[in-house]
C-alpha cells in the first residue's frame, strides 16, 4: 500500500525477505527499549530469535512502514485462538510520529486479519505510555475487555475488535460514498 504527496511517500509492505525480517527485529528492539519494560513474560528474546515465527503466513502477518524509503514503523498479528488474532508490536519511530503512520499500520493489519478470515482481533496496551495508541484503538472500534492472558505489568488494558463489523472510520467513509460506490 502506498500513500503520499509531493513531499513524502509512505509505503506499508509485508516483511518477506531476510532484510525485512532484520528490519523488523531492529524495530522490535527499539520498541522494547522505548517501553522501558522487561518483556521476558512474553518470551521476547525467543520471539526475536525466531522471527517471523508466529507472525508468518498463513496465520500471521508482519508489516513494515517506510517513509521516503526510510524504515519508519512496524506492526504484526498472530493467531491466538480459533477465529481470534492478536495485534502486536505497533511501533513508529519517534521522528515519524504525528503523521498518521500508526493509523495506517493498524488499518493495514486489520485488513490483513479480515483477509485471513479472523473474526476478532485482540491487543493489550499500557497507559499512560501508550495513551495515543489507546485513542487510536478506540477510534478504530476496539473495546476494552477482561484480560485474556496474565500480564504482570500493572495497569495493562486489554481490547478487542469485532472484525465482522465496520469500524467507526469505515462507517464514516461509507457515508461519504455514493449509494453505488463500495466503501474502501
Go through the PLM ranges and name each one.
Residues 113-125:
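Conserved GNAT acetyl-CoA-binding A-motif
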Residues 2-6, 155-184:
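Terminal substrate-recognition subdomain of acyl/acetyltransferases
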Residues 123-133, 150-154:
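Conserved beta-strand-loop-alpha-helix junction that forms the acyl-donor binding cleft
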Residues 15-88, 93-94, 106-108, 112, ...:
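Acetyl-CoA-dependent GNAT
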Residues 93-99, 128:
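Active-site acidic-Proline motif in GNAT/NAT acetyltransferases
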Residues 69, 100, 117:
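Conserved G/P- and acidic residue-centered "switch" motifs that form tight phosphate/ATP-binding loops
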Residues 99, 103, 107:
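Residues forming the Rossmann-fold NAD(P)(H) cofactor-binding site
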